Amino acid sequence: MSVNKSIYEKFIIESADQQRTADISSGVLAFTYFENIFSPHLTARVVVTNTGGSVRGKDGVMQSIYNGLPLRGGERVLIKIAGNSKVNKGLDFSRDPENYFYIASITNVLIDEGSETFTLNLVSREAITNETVRVGKKFPTSQKISDSVKDILKKYLRSENKIGTIDETQNPYGFIGNMKKPFTIITWLASKSVSGKSESNKDDSSAGFLFYETQQGFNFRSIDDLMEQKPYKKEFTYTPGAISTDDPNKDFKILQYGIDRNQDLLSKLEKGAYSSQRYYINPVSFVPNISVFNSNNYVEKLSNLGDQTISLPKIDDKSDKTLGDLPSRIFVGMLDVGTIEEDASDEGWNDPVKRNADPAKIHAQSMMRYNQLHTQVVNLTIPMNT
């Protein structure tokens, strides 16, 4: 949301053949830009109104933008929005073709006599590239997950110049791409990743990463590392009502807020967020691996957004056990030993320390971490965006 009027310095659409352009900066009714830590790419939405005779078509006749370019999806969009206050830096997606937006779809098209209105749904280039490539490479068991993520971004998404912060992972992991899409593989690897800041083989409580894109590029971040960052130096204050455009502190005032979700006990029990029992069979030695995951063993090790320690309720008044003591979900699976290793030896087959991303530990911890991240969902409206 913006209090001051946005300043559109550039808002240009290129035709699919890049032979014609249309400047729509004067016809933008609304522009919404999204960075989402749960989305692997940027998205944006722009509502445009336009009068006829804006673009010269292929036949040389002046036409509307929708039919003159024409708009059919895949066109590039250059956007530059100046900062509308002393603290806002604005948005610039016009300096490098690698940062241009692409039209994913055109919706809400209304054509009247002499005018037209439509909505452009935009994505970053990698969202389209992701649909056209597949990863078939075999990644060795000696390579860290963070290095595999960098390889996929560079070789398959061709985004070597858009790599942001890639947190180093502690654990290596060998796998085969199986012709899956790059974004699918990276988000899958995120759930198997352990922060490199954890003590090797002793403290894996920080399992769980996030993969997302910002203006600075693609980021592969540990949830623990994100939570351990220093708080923002300014405090945001709930101030309902009108906000003055001349108020220097308007960027740090919350106009309205709503709590979309605050705990979902049954959902967490169904997912085994507190405690789960796991049965894994080694297909090489046929030795079963049976373990119980108990979140109480990790509560003190976790980084949280608040100061209070997570406390789970008791099951009933006659028992001292909490919801973190008894498994609420059972997992059954096969260990992927004997498929990726270069040497046909039994090393690591029954050694959980050398096992390829031991799911009995990492899967349980990452599931607990993701569920804790969604304990509360709050929707805030802050008048700080350009």
Q: Locations of the language-model features?
A:
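Assembly/oligomerization scaffold segments
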Residues: 1-132
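An acidic/polar, Gly/Ser/Thr-rich interaction patch typically located in mid-to-C-terminal regions
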Residues: 34, 38-69, 243-386
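Glycine-centered loop/turn motifs
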Residues: 72-78, 142, 235, 241
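Short secondary-structure capping/junction motifs at helix and strand boundaries
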Residues: 88-91, 100, 159-164, 197-201, ...
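Short beta-strand-centered interaction patches in the first periplasmic/extracellular domains
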Residues: 117, 124-126, 165-277, 281, ...
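N-terminal export/assembly leaders
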Residues: 130-133, 149-177
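Alpha-helical support elements that line or immediately flank enzyme active sites
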Residues: 137-144
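Extracytoplasmic/secreted envelope proteins and their assembly/folding machinery
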Residues: 146-150, 186
